[in-house]
Amino acid sequence: MGKVIGIDLGTTNSAMAVYEGNEAKIIANKEGKNTTPSIVAFTDKGEILVGESAKRQAVTNPEKTIYSIKRIMGLMFNEDKAKEAEKRLPYKIVDRNGACAIEISGKVYTPQEISAKILMKLKEDAESYLGESVTEAVITVPAYFNDSQRKATKEAGTIAGLNVLRIINEPTSAALAYGLDKKESEKIMVYDLGGGTFDVTVLETGDNVVEVLATGGDAFLGGDDFDNRVIDFLASEFKSETGIEIKNDVMALQRLKEAAENAKKELSSAMETEINLPFITADATGPKHLVKKLTRAKFESLTEDLMEETISKIESVIKDAGLTKNEISEVVMVGGSTRIPKVQERVKAFINKELNKSVNPDEVVAVGASIQGGVLKGDVKDVLLLDVTPLSLGIETLGGVMTKVIDRGTTIPAKKSQVFSTAEDNQPAVSIMVLQGERELARDNKSLGKFDLQGIAPAPRGVPQIEVTFDIDANGILTVSAQDKNTGKSQEIKISGSSGLSDSEIEKMVKDAELHKEEDARKKEVIEARNHADSLAHQTQKSLDEHKTNLNENDANEIQNAINALKDCIKNDNATKAELEDKTKALAQAAQKLGEAMANKNNAEQPKKKDDDVIDAEVE
Protein backbone atom coordinates (compact mmCIF):
# COMPACT_ATOMS: atom_id res chain seq x y z
CA MET A 1 0.00 0.00 0.00
CA GLY A 2 1.43 3.36 -1.08
CA LYS A 3 0.82 6.69 0.57
CA VAL A 4 -2.80 7.74 1.16
CA ILE A 5 -3.47 11.43 0.55
CA GLY A 6 -6.15 13.43 2.32
CA ILE A 7 -8.11 15.75 0.04
CA ASP A 8 -10.35 18.67 0.96
CA LEU A 9 -12.35 19.05 -2.27
CA GLY A 10 -13.71 22.53 -1.66
CA THR A 11 -16.23 24.73 -3.44
CA THR A 12 -13.74 27.56 -3.92
CA ASN A 13 -10.36 26.00 -3.14
CA SER A 14 -9.02 22.50 -2.59
CA ALA A 15 -6.11 21.27 -0.48
CA MET A 16 -4.25 18.01 0.08
CA ALA A 17 -2.06 16.51 2.78
CA VAL A 18 -0.20 13.31 3.56
CA TYR A 19 0.66 11.53 6.81
CA GLU A 20 4.33 10.55 6.89
CA GLY A 21 7.04 10.50 9.50
CA ASN A 22 4.42 10.49 12.28
CA GLU A 23 2.95 13.82 11.23
CA ALA A 24 0.47 15.25 8.73
CA LYS A 25 1.96 17.56 6.12
CA ILE A 26 0.24 19.86 3.66
CA ILE A 27 1.28 19.15 0.06
CA ALA A 28 2.02 22.25 -2.00
CA ASN A 29 0.85 22.23 -5.63
CA LYS A 30 3.21 22.68 -8.59
CA GLU A 31 2.73 26.44 -8.32
CA GLY A 32 4.10 26.28 -4.77
CA LYS A 33 0.77 27.10 -3.07
CA ASN A 34 -0.96 25.12 -0.36
CA THR A 35 -4.41 25.54 -1.90
CA THR A 36 -5.62 25.10 -5.48
CA PRO A 37 -8.63 27.00 -6.90
CA SER A 38 -11.45 24.54 -7.63
CA ILE A 39 -11.80 25.89 -11.16
CA VAL A 40 -11.72 24.15 -14.55
CA ALA A 41 -11.61 26.03 -17.88
CA PHE A 42 -11.99 24.91 -21.49
CA THR A 43 -10.15 27.13 -24.00
CA ASP A 44 -11.03 27.74 -27.65
CA LYS A 45 -7.90 25.77 -28.57
CA GLY A 46 -9.25 22.68 -26.83
CA GLU A 47 -6.95 22.99 -23.83
CA ILE A 48 -8.24 22.18 -20.33
CA LEU A 49 -6.92 24.39 -17.53
CA VAL A 50 -7.23 23.61 -13.83
CA GLY A 51 -6.52 25.76 -10.77
CA GLU A 52 -4.65 29.08 -10.93
CA SER A 53 -4.33 29.05 -14.73
CA ALA A 54 -8.09 28.56 -15.09
CA LYS A 55 -8.82 31.34 -12.61
CA ARG A 56 -6.56 33.83 -14.40
CA GLN A 57 -8.48 33.63 -17.69
CA ALA A 58 -12.01 33.53 -16.19
CA VAL A 59 -12.91 37.13 -17.10
CA THR A 60 -12.20 36.63 -20.80
CA ASN A 61 -13.76 33.14 -20.92
CA PRO A 62 -16.65 33.17 -18.42
CA GLU A 63 -19.00 30.71 -20.16
CA LYS A 64 -16.33 28.02 -20.36
CA THR A 65 -14.82 28.54 -16.91
CA ILE A 66 -16.38 26.24 -14.36
CA TYR A 67 -16.26 27.22 -10.68
CA SER A 68 -18.38 26.22 -7.66
CA ILE A 69 -19.17 22.87 -9.31
CA LYS A 70 -19.60 21.42 -5.82
CA ARG A 71 -22.85 23.38 -5.56
CA ILE A 72 -24.54 21.17 -8.16
CA MET A 73 -22.81 17.91 -7.22
CA GLY A 74 -25.49 15.22 -6.86
CA LEU A 75 -28.34 17.71 -7.48
CA MET A 76 -31.38 16.83 -9.57
CA PHE A 77 -32.14 19.31 -12.36
CA ASN A 78 -35.64 20.08 -11.08
CA GLU A 79 -34.50 20.99 -7.55
CA ASP A 80 -34.89 24.60 -6.43
CA LYS A 81 -31.20 24.81 -5.52
CA ALA A 82 -30.28 23.85 -9.08
CA LYS A 83 -32.46 26.64 -10.44
CA GLU A 84 -30.82 29.12 -8.05
CA ALA A 85 -27.37 27.99 -9.18
CA GLU A 86 -28.39 28.35 -12.82
CA LYS A 87 -29.24 32.02 -12.26
CA ARG A 88 -25.92 32.73 -10.55
CA LEU A 89 -23.44 30.76 -12.63
CA PRO A 90 -22.31 31.96 -16.08
CA TYR A 91 -21.97 28.50 -17.59
CA LYS A 92 -24.86 26.44 -18.95
CA ILE A 93 -26.50 23.91 -16.60
CA VAL A 94 -28.48 21.19 -18.40
CA ASP A 95 -30.62 18.17 -17.60
CA ARG A 96 -28.83 14.83 -17.95
CA ASN A 97 -31.07 11.89 -17.03
CA GLY A 98 -32.80 14.10 -14.47
CA ALA A 99 -29.54 15.20 -12.84
CA CYS A 100 -27.60 18.46 -13.19
CA ALA A 101 -24.81 18.57 -15.74
CA ILE A 102 -23.06 21.35 -17.67
CA GLU A 103 -22.71 21.95 -21.38
CA ILE A 104 -19.50 23.29 -22.91
CA SER A 105 -19.28 23.76 -26.70
CA GLY A 106 -22.06 21.25 -27.27
CA LYS A 107 -20.55 18.58 -25.00
CA VAL A 108 -22.20 17.60 -21.72
CA TYR A 109 -20.11 17.01 -18.58
CA THR A 110 -21.33 15.75 -15.22
CA PRO A 111 -20.23 17.49 -12.00
CA GLN A 112 -18.31 14.30 -11.22
CA GLU A 113 -16.27 14.70 -14.40
CA ILE A 114 -15.43 18.34 -13.66
CA SER A 115 -14.54 17.51 -10.04
CA ALA A 116 -12.41 14.64 -11.32
CA LYS A 117 -10.31 17.10 -13.33
CA ILE A 118 -9.59 19.02 -10.11
CA LEU A 119 -8.75 15.76 -8.34
CA MET A 120 -6.48 14.72 -11.21
CA LYS A 121 -4.53 17.97 -10.83
CA LEU A 122 -4.18 17.35 -7.08
CA LYS A 123 -3.16 13.73 -7.69
CA GLU A 124 -0.47 14.72 -10.21
CA ASP A 125 0.88 17.47 -7.95
CA ALA A 126 0.97 15.05 -4.99
CA GLU A 127 2.87 12.52 -7.09
CA SER A 128 5.37 15.22 -8.07
CA TYR A 129 5.79 16.24 -4.41
CA LEU A 130 6.10 12.68 -3.06
CA GLY A 131 8.07 11.24 -5.94
CA GLU A 132 5.82 8.20 -6.21
CA SER A 133 2.49 7.10 -7.65
CA VAL A 134 -0.64 7.99 -5.66
CA THR A 135 -3.69 5.76 -6.04
CA GLU A 136 -5.55 6.05 -2.73
CA ALA A 137 -7.25 8.94 -0.99
CA VAL A 138 -9.59 10.04 1.77
CA ILE A 139 -11.89 12.81 0.52
CA THR A 140 -13.94 15.15 2.70
CA VAL A 141 -17.51 16.36 2.16
CA PRO A 142 -19.83 18.73 4.05
CA ALA A 143 -21.50 16.99 7.00
CA TYR A 144 -24.92 17.58 5.46
CA PHE A 145 -24.09 16.19 2.01
CA ASN A 146 -26.84 13.68 1.17
CA ASP A 147 -26.31 10.17 -0.15
CA SER A 148 -26.26 11.10 -3.84
CA GLN A 149 -23.77 13.93 -3.19
CA ARG A 150 -21.46 11.59 -1.28
CA LYS A 151 -21.78 8.97 -3.99
CA ALA A 152 -21.02 11.57 -6.68
CA THR A 153 -17.90 12.67 -4.78
CA LYS A 154 -16.69 9.08 -4.59
CA GLU A 155 -17.38 8.66 -8.32
CA ALA A 156 -15.31 11.77 -9.07
CA GLY A 157 -12.41 10.16 -7.23
CA THR A 158 -12.80 6.99 -9.25
CA ILE A 159 -12.84 8.97 -12.51
CA ALA A 160 -9.63 10.68 -11.38
CA GLY A 161 -7.95 7.31 -10.89
CA LEU A 162 -8.19 7.27 -7.13
CA ASN A 163 -9.41 4.50 -4.89
CA VAL A 164 -11.43 6.51 -2.36
CA LEU A 165 -10.88 4.63 0.89
CA ARG A 166 -13.24 6.83 2.87
CA ILE A 167 -15.58 9.80 2.56
CA ILE A 168 -15.53 11.76 5.85
CA ASN A 169 -17.26 14.91 7.02
CA GLU A 170 -15.28 18.15 6.86
CA PRO A 171 -15.83 19.34 10.46
CA THR A 172 -15.09 15.84 11.75
CA SER A 173 -11.87 15.85 9.76
CA ALA A 174 -10.94 19.24 11.21
CA ALA A 175 -11.61 17.95 14.72
CA LEU A 176 -9.42 14.93 14.02
CA ALA A 177 -6.55 17.26 13.10
CA TYR A 178 -7.18 19.50 16.11
CA GLY A 179 -7.87 16.83 18.72
CA LEU A 180 -5.41 14.07 17.87
CA ASP A 181 -2.97 14.97 20.63
CA LYS A 182 -5.60 15.84 23.24
CA LYS A 183 -5.40 13.51 26.22
CA GLU A 184 -8.05 15.15 28.38
CA SER A 185 -11.66 14.92 27.31
CA GLU A 186 -12.94 18.10 25.65
CA LYS A 187 -16.21 19.02 24.03
CA ILE A 188 -15.36 21.14 21.01
CA MET A 189 -17.43 22.86 18.37
CA VAL A 190 -16.16 23.10 14.81
CA TYR A 191 -17.61 26.07 12.92
CA ASP A 192 -16.85 25.48 9.24
CA LEU A 193 -17.84 28.27 6.85
CA GLY A 194 -16.30 27.61 3.47
CA GLY A 195 -16.78 28.94 -0.03
CA GLY A 196 -20.06 27.17 -0.69
CA THR A 197 -21.06 25.23 2.40
CA PHE A 198 -21.55 25.66 6.13
CA ASP A 199 -21.25 22.97 8.80
CA VAL A 200 -21.28 23.09 12.56
CA THR A 201 -20.41 20.00 14.55
CA VAL A 202 -20.09 19.35 18.27
CA LEU A 203 -17.60 16.60 19.13
CA GLU A 204 -15.98 15.06 22.14
CA THR A 205 -12.23 14.51 21.81
CA GLY A 206 -9.68 12.99 24.12
CA ASP A 207 -7.51 9.92 24.58
CA ASN A 208 -7.33 9.40 20.81
CA VAL A 209 -11.11 9.22 20.39
CA VAL A 210 -13.03 11.73 18.26
CA GLU A 211 -16.78 11.25 18.72
CA VAL A 212 -19.42 13.34 16.96
CA LEU A 213 -22.24 14.32 19.32
CA ALA A 214 -24.34 16.32 16.84
CA THR A 215 -24.01 17.95 13.45
CA GLY A 216 -25.90 20.45 11.33
CA GLY A 217 -25.41 22.86 8.49
CA ASP A 218 -26.37 23.99 5.03
CA ALA A 219 -24.70 22.80 1.82
CA PHE A 220 -25.79 26.04 0.14
CA LEU A 221 -24.43 28.67 2.50
CA GLY A 222 -20.88 29.96 2.18
CA GLY A 223 -18.52 32.62 0.88
CA ASP A 224 -20.20 32.53 -2.55
CA ASP A 225 -23.40 33.78 -0.94
CA PHE A 226 -21.56 36.66 0.74
CA ASP A 227 -20.03 37.52 -2.66
CA ASN A 228 -23.47 37.38 -4.28
CA ARG A 229 -24.82 39.97 -1.84
CA VAL A 230 -22.05 42.35 -2.90
CA ILE A 231 -22.66 41.56 -6.59
CA ASP A 232 -26.38 42.28 -6.21
CA PHE A 233 -25.64 45.54 -4.39
CA LEU A 234 -23.16 46.74 -7.02
CA ALA A 235 -25.44 45.73 -9.89
CA SER A 236 -28.40 47.49 -8.28
CA GLU A 237 -26.40 50.68 -7.69
CA PHE A 238 -25.08 50.59 -11.26
CA LYS A 239 -28.57 50.12 -12.67
CA SER A 240 -29.98 53.03 -10.69
CA GLU A 241 -27.17 55.25 -12.00
CA THR A 242 -27.12 54.09 -15.65
CA GLY A 243 -30.32 52.13 -16.27
CA ILE A 244 -28.24 49.14 -17.43
CA GLU A 245 -28.78 45.63 -16.01
CA ILE A 246 -25.17 44.59 -15.80
CA LYS A 247 -25.88 41.02 -14.63
CA ASN A 248 -27.17 40.10 -18.09
CA ASP A 249 -23.62 40.44 -19.47
CA VAL A 250 -21.69 37.26 -18.53
CA MET A 251 -18.27 38.88 -18.94
CA ALA A 252 -19.28 41.85 -16.79
CA LEU A 253 -20.78 39.45 -14.25
CA GLN A 254 -17.49 37.57 -14.00
CA ARG A 255 -15.63 40.83 -13.40
CA LEU A 256 -18.20 41.72 -10.74
CA LYS A 257 -17.71 38.35 -9.06
CA GLU A 258 -13.95 38.76 -8.85
CA ALA A 259 -14.31 42.34 -7.59
CA ALA A 260 -16.85 41.28 -4.95
CA GLU A 261 -14.60 38.46 -3.72
CA ASN A 262 -11.57 40.76 -3.54
CA ALA A 263 -13.57 43.45 -1.73
CA LYS A 264 -14.76 40.91 0.83
CA LYS A 265 -11.17 39.83 1.50
CA GLU A 266 -9.89 43.42 1.73
CA LEU A 267 -12.62 44.31 4.22
CA SER A 268 -11.28 41.65 6.59
CA SER A 269 -8.37 43.98 7.32
CA ALA A 270 -9.61 47.40 6.10
CA MET A 271 -12.67 49.43 7.07
CA GLU A 272 -13.31 50.57 3.49
CA THR A 273 -12.36 49.51 -0.04
CA GLU A 274 -12.93 50.89 -3.52
CA ILE A 275 -14.26 48.76 -6.36
CA ASN A 276 -13.02 50.15 -9.67
CA LEU A 277 -14.09 48.41 -12.89
CA PRO A 278 -13.41 50.59 -15.93
CA PHE A 279 -15.21 49.84 -19.20
CA ILE A 280 -17.52 47.38 -17.47
CA THR A 281 -20.06 47.83 -20.27
CA ALA A 282 -21.27 50.35 -22.85
CA ASP A 283 -24.43 51.79 -24.37
CA ALA A 284 -25.25 54.28 -27.14
CA THR A 285 -23.73 57.11 -25.11
CA GLY A 286 -20.38 55.36 -24.78
CA PRO A 287 -18.42 53.17 -22.33
CA LYS A 288 -19.49 52.88 -18.68
CA HIS A 289 -17.28 52.51 -15.63
CA LEU A 290 -18.18 51.12 -12.22
CA VAL A 291 -16.54 52.92 -9.32
CA LYS A 292 -17.96 52.34 -5.86
CA LYS A 293 -16.76 52.56 -2.27
CA LEU A 294 -17.81 49.72 0.02
CA THR A 295 -17.42 50.02 3.78
CA ARG A 296 -17.13 47.12 6.19
CA ALA A 297 -20.33 48.30 7.87
CA LYS A 298 -22.23 48.16 4.56
CA PHE A 299 -20.85 44.70 3.80
CA GLU A 300 -21.96 43.51 7.23
CA SER A 301 -25.46 44.91 6.74
CA LEU A 302 -25.72 43.20 3.33
CA THR A 303 -24.79 39.82 4.82
CA GLU A 304 -26.20 40.06 8.34
CA ASP A 305 -28.96 37.49 7.77
CA LEU A 306 -26.44 34.94 6.46
CA MET A 307 -24.36 35.30 9.61
CA GLU A 308 -27.45 35.02 11.82
CA GLU A 309 -28.47 31.85 9.98
CA THR A 310 -25.21 30.23 11.05
CA ILE A 311 -25.81 31.30 14.65
CA SER A 312 -29.29 29.70 14.69
CA LYS A 313 -27.76 26.46 13.44
CA ILE A 314 -25.11 26.58 16.20
CA GLU A 315 -27.91 26.89 18.75
CA SER A 316 -29.83 23.88 17.41
CA VAL A 317 -26.72 21.67 17.13
CA ILE A 318 -25.64 22.38 20.72
CA LYS A 319 -29.19 21.51 21.79
CA ASP A 320 -29.09 18.28 19.75
CA ALA A 321 -25.82 17.37 21.48
CA GLY A 322 -27.59 17.65 24.83
CA LEU A 323 -25.23 20.40 25.96
CA THR A 324 -25.29 24.05 26.94
CA LYS A 325 -23.03 26.76 25.52
CA ASN A 326 -21.03 26.76 28.76
CA GLU A 327 -20.07 23.10 28.29
CA ILE A 328 -18.25 23.81 25.00
CA SER A 329 -14.50 23.85 25.78
CA GLU A 330 -13.20 25.14 22.45
CA VAL A 331 -14.56 26.65 19.24
CA VAL A 332 -12.41 25.77 16.23
CA MET A 333 -12.90 28.05 13.22
CA VAL A 334 -12.53 26.36 9.83
CA GLY A 335 -12.97 27.58 6.25
CA GLY A 336 -11.79 30.74 4.52
CA SER A 337 -15.01 32.63 5.23
CA THR A 338 -14.30 32.52 8.97
CA ARG A 339 -11.75 35.27 8.33
CA ILE A 340 -14.66 37.73 8.05
CA PRO A 341 -14.40 39.84 11.25
CA LYS A 342 -18.16 39.99 11.84
CA VAL A 343 -18.44 36.20 11.59
CA GLN A 344 -15.81 35.84 14.32
CA GLU A 345 -17.48 38.54 16.40
CA ARG A 346 -20.94 36.93 16.24
CA VAL A 347 -19.71 33.43 17.05
CA LYS A 348 -17.59 34.71 19.93
CA ALA A 349 -20.50 36.74 21.32
CA PHE A 350 -22.89 33.80 21.11
CA ILE A 351 -20.57 31.22 22.68
CA ASN A 352 -19.08 33.79 25.08
CA LYS A 353 -15.50 32.57 24.83
CA GLU A 354 -12.38 33.22 22.79
CA LEU A 355 -12.20 31.42 19.45
CA ASN A 356 -9.43 28.93 18.74
CA LYS A 357 -7.53 30.14 15.67
CA SER A 358 -4.54 27.86 16.10
CA VAL A 359 -5.43 25.87 12.98
CA ASN A 360 -5.09 27.15 9.42
CA PRO A 361 -8.72 27.40 8.24
CA ASP A 362 -7.79 26.56 4.64
CA GLU A 363 -5.65 23.53 5.46
CA VAL A 364 -6.95 21.82 8.60
CA VAL A 365 -9.63 19.74 6.82
CA ALA A 366 -7.09 18.21 4.42
CA VAL A 367 -4.75 17.57 7.36
CA GLY A 368 -7.51 15.67 9.18
CA ALA A 369 -8.27 13.65 6.05
CA SER A 370 -4.60 12.64 5.80
CA ILE A 371 -4.67 11.51 9.44
CA GLN A 372 -7.70 9.36 8.64
CA GLY A 373 -5.69 7.99 5.72
CA GLY A 374 -2.93 7.18 8.19
CA VAL A 375 -5.44 5.38 10.40
CA LEU A 376 -6.69 3.29 7.47
CA LYS A 377 -3.14 2.49 6.40
CA GLY A 378 -2.09 1.58 9.93
CA ASP A 379 0.43 4.39 10.40
CA VAL A 380 -1.72 6.09 13.05
CA LYS A 381 -2.48 3.74 15.93
CA ASP A 382 -5.33 3.66 18.43
CA VAL A 383 -7.34 6.52 16.92
CA LEU A 384 -11.09 6.00 16.86
CA LEU A 385 -13.34 8.24 14.75
CA LEU A 386 -17.06 8.03 15.55
CA ASP A 387 -19.35 9.96 13.17
CA VAL A 388 -23.16 10.07 13.12
CA THR A 389 -26.13 10.11 10.77
CA PRO A 390 -27.87 13.53 10.79
CA LEU A 391 -31.53 12.39 10.50
CA SER A 392 -33.65 9.36 11.38
CA LEU A 393 -34.27 6.68 8.76
CA GLY A 394 -37.29 4.39 8.50
CA ILE A 395 -40.15 3.09 6.37
CA GLU A 396 -43.83 3.88 5.82
CA THR A 397 -46.18 1.49 7.64
CA LEU A 398 -49.95 1.03 7.74
CA GLY A 399 -51.89 4.25 8.07
CA GLY A 400 -49.09 6.39 6.67
CA VAL A 401 -46.92 6.26 9.79
CA MET A 402 -43.14 6.74 9.68
CA THR A 403 -41.65 3.80 11.61
CA LYS A 404 -38.02 4.57 12.47
CA VAL A 405 -35.36 1.91 11.98
CA ILE A 406 -32.24 4.03 12.63
CA ASP A 407 -32.52 7.12 14.86
CA ARG A 408 -30.87 10.46 14.20
CA GLY A 409 -27.46 10.71 15.86
CA THR A 410 -26.69 7.00 15.49
CA THR A 411 -22.95 6.35 15.18
CA ILE A 412 -21.93 5.10 11.74
CA PRO A 413 -21.25 2.63 10.26
CA ALA A 414 -24.55 1.16 11.44
CA LYS A 415 -26.74 -1.80 10.56
CA LYS A 416 -30.16 -2.45 12.04
CA SER A 417 -33.05 -4.75 11.18
CA GLN A 418 -36.73 -4.86 12.15
CA VAL A 419 -39.42 -7.36 11.23
CA PHE A 420 -42.68 -6.15 9.71
CA SER A 421 -45.69 -7.99 8.26
CA THR A 422 -48.49 -7.71 5.67
CA ALA A 423 -51.65 -5.59 5.88
CA GLU A 424 -53.97 -7.84 3.83
CA ASP A 425 -54.75 -11.54 3.63
CA ASN A 426 -52.78 -13.35 0.89
CA GLN A 427 -50.81 -10.20 0.05
CA PRO A 428 -48.32 -11.26 -2.68
CA ALA A 429 -45.93 -8.30 -2.37
CA VAL A 430 -44.99 -5.37 -0.13
CA SER A 431 -43.81 -1.93 -1.17
CA ILE A 432 -41.00 -0.58 0.99
CA MET A 433 -40.97 3.24 1.06
CA VAL A 434 -37.68 4.43 2.57
CA LEU A 435 -37.97 7.70 4.50
CA GLN A 436 -35.67 10.21 6.20
CA GLY A 437 -36.80 12.78 8.74
CA GLU A 438 -38.17 13.41 12.21
CA ARG A 439 -41.95 13.66 11.66
CA GLU A 440 -44.44 11.02 12.83
CA LEU A 441 -46.31 10.78 9.52
CA ALA A 442 -44.67 9.43 6.36
CA ARG A 443 -45.95 12.22 4.11
CA ASP A 444 -44.16 14.85 6.21
CA ASN A 445 -40.75 13.20 5.73
CA LYS A 446 -38.42 12.95 2.74
CA SER A 447 -38.90 9.92 0.50
CA LEU A 448 -35.49 8.45 -0.33
CA GLY A 449 -36.66 5.64 -2.57
CA LYS A 450 -39.13 2.80 -3.01
CA PHE A 451 -38.81 -0.86 -3.93
CA ASP A 452 -41.08 -3.94 -4.00
CA LEU A 453 -40.56 -7.38 -2.47
CA GLN A 454 -42.50 -9.84 -4.64
CA GLY A 455 -43.42 -13.50 -4.24
CA ILE A 456 -44.68 -13.56 -0.66
CA ALA A 457 -46.38 -16.92 0.00
CA PRO A 458 -50.19 -16.68 0.50
CA ALA A 459 -50.98 -16.27 4.20
CA PRO A 460 -53.34 -14.36 6.51
CA ARG A 461 -52.41 -10.77 7.25
CA GLY A 462 -49.86 -10.41 10.01
CA VAL A 463 -48.38 -13.88 9.47
CA PRO A 464 -45.56 -13.27 6.91
CA GLN A 465 -42.36 -11.95 8.43
CA ILE A 466 -40.59 -9.32 6.32
CA GLU A 467 -37.18 -8.40 7.71
CA VAL A 468 -36.14 -4.88 6.65
CA THR A 469 -32.45 -4.03 7.10
CA PHE A 470 -30.88 -0.56 6.95
CA ASP A 471 -27.11 -0.54 6.39
CA ILE A 472 -25.14 2.74 6.47
CA ASP A 473 -21.47 2.35 5.64
CA ALA A 474 -18.60 4.46 6.99
CA ASN A 475 -19.04 6.85 4.04
CA GLY A 476 -22.65 7.56 5.09
CA ILE A 477 -24.04 5.76 2.02
CA LEU A 478 -27.28 3.85 2.67
CA THR A 479 -28.46 0.44 1.45
CA VAL A 480 -31.90 -0.93 2.39
CA SER A 481 -32.91 -4.57 1.95
CA ALA A 482 -36.04 -6.61 2.64
CA GLN A 483 -36.29 -10.39 3.00
CA ASP A 484 -39.28 -12.72 3.37
CA LYS A 485 -38.09 -14.92 6.25
CA ASN A 486 -40.38 -17.73 5.09
CA THR A 487 -39.35 -17.97 1.41
CA GLY A 488 -35.90 -16.40 1.68
CA LYS A 489 -36.69 -14.04 -1.22
CA SER A 490 -35.00 -10.66 -0.90
CA GLN A 491 -34.64 -7.28 -2.59
CA GLU A 492 -32.45 -4.26 -1.90
CA ILE A 493 -32.00 -0.65 -2.96
CA LYS A 494 -28.92 1.59 -2.76
CA ILE A 495 -30.20 5.11 -2.23
CA SER A 496 -29.01 7.43 -5.00
CA GLY A 497 -30.10 9.93 -7.65
CA SER A 498 -33.20 11.92 -6.82
CA SER A 499 -33.45 10.28 -3.41
CA GLY A 500 -31.07 12.71 -1.71
CA LEU A 501 -32.04 15.43 0.73
CA SER A 502 -31.33 19.07 0.18
CA ASP A 503 -30.01 20.79 3.30
CA SER A 504 -32.84 23.30 3.43
CA GLU A 505 -35.25 20.35 3.51
CA ILE A 506 -33.31 18.77 6.38
CA GLU A 507 -33.37 22.02 8.33
CA LYS A 508 -37.09 22.43 7.60
CA MET A 509 -37.79 18.88 8.76
CA VAL A 510 -36.09 19.44 12.10
CA LYS A 511 -37.93 22.75 12.63
CA ASP A 512 -41.26 21.28 11.52
CA ALA A 513 -40.77 18.33 13.84
CA GLU A 514 -40.45 20.74 16.78
CA LEU A 515 -43.39 22.91 15.68
CA HIS A 516 -45.71 19.97 15.02
CA LYS A 517 -44.58 17.59 17.76
CA GLU A 518 -47.84 17.57 19.72
CA GLU A 519 -50.00 17.60 16.60
CA ASP A 520 -48.06 14.70 15.11
CA ALA A 521 -48.34 12.73 18.34
CA ARG A 522 -52.15 13.17 18.35
CA LYS A 523 -52.41 12.08 14.72
CA LYS A 524 -50.26 9.04 15.43
CA GLU A 525 -52.47 8.06 18.39
CA VAL A 526 -55.57 8.19 16.15
CA ILE A 527 -53.85 6.07 13.48
CA GLU A 528 -52.75 3.51 16.08
CA ALA A 529 -56.29 3.39 17.52
CA ARG A 530 -57.68 2.91 13.98
CA ASN A 531 -55.15 0.15 13.23
CA HIS A 532 -56.02 -1.64 16.50
CA ALA A 533 -59.75 -1.30 15.76
CA ASP A 534 -59.32 -2.63 12.22
CA SER A 535 -57.37 -5.63 13.48
CA LEU A 536 -60.02 -6.48 16.09
CA ALA A 537 -62.89 -6.06 13.60
CA HIS A 538 -61.11 -8.29 11.06
CA GLN A 539 -60.31 -11.05 13.58
CA THR A 540 -63.75 -10.99 15.22
CA GLN A 541 -65.54 -11.13 11.86
CA LYS A 542 -63.41 -14.13 10.86
CA SER A 543 -64.16 -15.95 14.14
CA LEU A 544 -67.87 -15.11 13.94
CA ASP A 545 -68.14 -16.51 10.41
CA GLU A 546 -66.45 -19.74 11.55
CA HIS A 547 -68.36 -20.25 14.82
CA LYS A 548 -71.73 -18.55 14.25
CA THR A 549 -73.56 -21.87 14.65
CA ASN A 550 -72.37 -22.08 18.25
CA LEU A 551 -74.18 -18.83 19.16
CA ASN A 552 -77.83 -18.01 19.57
CA GLU A 553 -79.21 -15.56 17.00
CA ASN A 554 -79.43 -12.58 19.37
CA ASP A 555 -75.80 -12.90 20.47
CA ALA A 556 -74.63 -13.33 16.87
CA ASN A 557 -76.57 -10.23 15.77
CA GLU A 558 -75.20 -8.21 18.70
CA ILE A 559 -71.62 -9.09 17.75
CA GLN A 560 -72.24 -8.39 14.05
CA ASN A 561 -73.79 -5.00 14.88
CA ALA A 562 -70.76 -4.13 17.04
CA ILE A 563 -68.44 -5.13 14.17
CA ASN A 564 -70.42 -2.98 11.71
CA ALA A 565 -70.43 -0.01 14.09
CA LEU A 566 -66.66 -0.26 14.53
CA LYS A 567 -66.10 -0.56 10.76
CA ASP A 568 -68.22 2.56 10.17
CA CYS A 569 -66.15 4.41 12.75
CA ILE A 570 -62.91 3.23 11.07
CA LYS A 571 -64.14 4.53 7.69
CA ASN A 572 -64.91 7.95 9.19
CA ASP A 573 -61.78 10.06 8.58
CA ASN A 574 -62.92 12.51 11.27
CA ALA A 575 -63.30 9.87 13.98
CA THR A 576 -61.44 10.76 17.17
CA LYS A 577 -59.21 8.50 19.21
CA ALA A 578 -61.89 8.34 21.95
CA GLU A 579 -64.63 7.35 19.48
CA LEU A 580 -62.47 4.59 18.01
CA GLU A 581 -61.54 3.31 21.47
CA ASP A 582 -65.20 3.33 22.63
CA LYS A 583 -66.37 1.30 19.61
CA THR A 584 -63.39 -1.05 19.97
CA LYS A 585 -64.22 -1.60 23.65
CA ALA A 586 -67.87 -2.26 22.78
CA LEU A 587 -66.90 -4.92 20.25
CA ALA A 588 -64.44 -6.52 22.65
CA GLN A 589 -67.20 -6.84 25.27
CA ALA A 590 -69.71 -8.22 22.76
CA ALA A 591 -67.15 -10.70 21.45
CA GLN A 592 -66.71 -12.24 24.92
CA LYS A 593 -69.84 -14.33 24.27
CA LEU A 594 -68.22 -15.65 21.10
CA GLY A 595 -65.14 -16.67 23.09
CA GLU A 596 -67.28 -18.41 25.71
CA ALA A 597 -69.20 -20.33 23.06
CA MET A 598 -65.98 -21.40 21.35
CA ALA A 599 -64.49 -22.54 24.67
CA ASN A 600 -67.59 -24.49 25.56
CA LYS A 601 -67.38 -26.37 22.28
CA ASN A 602 -63.65 -26.90 22.82
CA ASN A 603 -62.92 -25.25 19.46
CA ALA A 604 -60.87 -22.35 20.71
CA GLU A 605 -57.66 -21.76 18.83
CA GLN A 606 -54.58 -21.19 20.93
CA PRO A 607 -53.34 -17.66 20.17
CA LYS A 608 -50.07 -17.75 18.25
CA LYS A 609 -47.19 -16.37 20.26
CA LYS A 610 -45.77 -13.24 18.67
CA ASP A 611 -42.09 -13.23 17.74
CA ASP A 612 -40.22 -10.83 20.00
CA ASP A 613 -38.61 -9.41 16.85
CA VAL A 614 -41.87 -8.50 15.12
CA ILE A 615 -42.78 -4.83 15.23
CA ASP A 616 -46.49 -4.18 15.75
CA ALA A 617 -46.79 -2.37 12.43
CA GLU A 618 -47.85 -3.48 9.00
CA VAL A 619 -46.59 -2.64 5.53
CA GLU A 620 -49.16 -1.79 2.90
Curated annotation (Swiss-Prot):
Alphabetized PROSITE patterns for the sequence: HSP70_1, HSP70_2, HSP70_3
Gene3D superfamilies recorded: 1.20.1270.10, 3.30.420.40, Actin, Chain A, domain 4, Substrate Binding Domain Of DNAk, Chain A, domain 1
ATP-binding recorded as keyword: yes
Protein name: Chaperone protein DnaK
GO molecular function list: ATP binding; ATP-dependent protein folding chaperone; unfolded protein binding
HAMAP family registered for this protein in UniProt: DnaK
Family annotation (CDD domains): ASKHA_NBD_HSP70_DnaK-like
Listed InterPro entries: ATPase_NBD, Chaperone_DnaK, Heat_shock_70_CS, HSP70_C_sf, HSP70_peptide-bd_sf, Hsp_70_fam
The gene coding this protein: dnaK
Up-regulation conditions: By stress conditions e.g. heat shock.
